[in-house]
């Protein structure tokens, strides 16, 4: 092990491009050996992902998942409900809101699983993961105007097998 520092000193950050979803910032930073370098970072809101679990008396538990089109990969994606946090919103509040909006389900129990930096090399935000249990179906979704989602119950075992 070494005592050498790896810390860079951020000197300046300038927004160079903005969209409704993220901003791109040009960042000037000074390296540990006193050299200045330019980097680019995506600045976006934190977001949440909720893993809704439907417990079955026979032990065949299921996950509640959503299928939707993802423009980044230009294909359908089967994923857990989630989305961007609103300003001032707590992660747990966002998790419950997103699950209700996308699936029509609420949860009596919700647990924080983890908070991660999805791509800290170029992104400034965090993703908060939650597990939701004791679900109730309100039978009413509240999708964004550009959101087209189908809700699917997928056996936990199937999801585990697909993950390899």
Where are these regions (language model features)?
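Short beta-strand micro-motifs in enzyme catalytic cores
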Residues: 23-27, 62, 126-128, 150
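Conserved Nudix-box catalytic region and its N-terminal flanking loop in Nudix hydrolases
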Residues: 5-8, 39-42, 51-54, 58-97
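A short, amphipathic edge element
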Residues: 2-14
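Short glycine/serine/proline-enriched coil/turn segments at secondary-structure junctions
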Residues: 19, 72-73, 120-122
């Amino acid at each position: 092990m070494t005592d050498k520092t790896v810390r860079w000193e951020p000197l300046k950050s300038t927004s160079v491009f903005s969209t409704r979803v993220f901003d791109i910032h040009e960042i000037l930073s000074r390296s540990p050996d006193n050299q200045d370098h330019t980097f680019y970072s995506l600045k976006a809101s934190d977001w949440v992902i909720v893993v809704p679990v439907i417990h079955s008396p026979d032990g065949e538990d299921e996950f509640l998942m959503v299928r939707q089109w993802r423009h980044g990969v230009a294909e359908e994606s089967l994923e857990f409900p989630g989305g961007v946090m609103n300003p001032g919103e707590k992660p747990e509040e966002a998790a419950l809101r997103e699950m209700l909006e996308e699936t029509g389900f609420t949860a009596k129990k919700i647990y924080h699983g983890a908070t991660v930096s999805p791509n800290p090399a170029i992104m400034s935000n965090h993703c908060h993961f939650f597990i939701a249990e004791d679900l109730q179906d309100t039978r009413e979704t509240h999708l964004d105007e550009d959101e087209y989602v189908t809700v699917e119950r997928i056996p936990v075992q199937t999801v585990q097998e697909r993950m390899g």
